[in-house]
A protein has these predicted regions:
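Extreme N-terminal starter segment of soluble prokaryotic enzymes
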Residues: 1-2
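Acetyl-CoA-dependent GNAT
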Residues: 5-71, 75, 94, 125-128, ...
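Charged catalytic carboxylate motif
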Residues: 13, 86-87, 113
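Active-site acidic-Proline motif in GNAT/NAT acetyltransferases
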Residues: 75-81, 109-110
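Conserved acetyl-CoA-binding loop-helix of GNAT-fold acetyltransferases
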Residues: 80-93, 120
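Conserved GNAT acetyl-CoA-binding A-motif
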Residues: 95-107
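Conserved beta-strand-loop-alpha-helix junction that forms the acyl-donor binding cleft
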Residues: 105-114, 132-136
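Short acidic, glycine/proline-enriched helix-loop-strand junctions
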Residues: 113-127
């Protein structure tokens, strides 16, 4: 497995992976728009590749103060094989090089499987309330 930065030729395969892993994502998370918006800011999209196929991806961000993991996706056939962990560690290292000292993420409170995954990587549940509003 190789982890590398997203390249334009990855776009269609990344969108397919996203749809497969996040079939119930709301319409405001439509992957082609999210990818375009993310690339306009930075190139913190990482691809896990095996034998020329995209098997996972991680989208991260850095606002100059905190780092964020926005999405980690691994194809069903490769889950629990270390791909997700490797992607997260790669993203964290890239953020660290940029000067980031803390990485945040948000997951649904009911998603216990993903909570366990992130805890295994050193993340802890913080006493925070996440709020949001749609403006567009």
């Amino acid at each position: 497995m190789k982890i590398r930065q997203f390249c334009e030729f990855d776009r269609s395969d990344l969108i397919k992976l996203w749809h497969a892993v996040f079939p119930d994502d709301p319409s405001h998370n439509e992957p082609s728009k999210v990818i375009e918006a993310k690339l306009a800011i930075d190139n913190l999209i990482f691809i896990a590749e095996h034998e020329g196929l995209i098997i996972g991806a991680c989208m991260a961000g850095y606002d100059g103060h905190r780092g964020w993991l926005y999405a980690v996706a691994v194809c069903n056939e490769q889950r629990r094989s270390g791909v997700g962990s490797a992607l997260v560690q790669h993203a964290i290292q890239a953020l660290k090089v940029m000067g980031c000292i803390k990485v945040n993420l948000q997951i649904r409170a009911t998603n216990t499987e993903v909570t366990t995954f992130y805890k295994s990587l050193g993340f802890v549940i913080e006493e925070r309330l996440s709020m949001g509003t749609f403006i567009g």
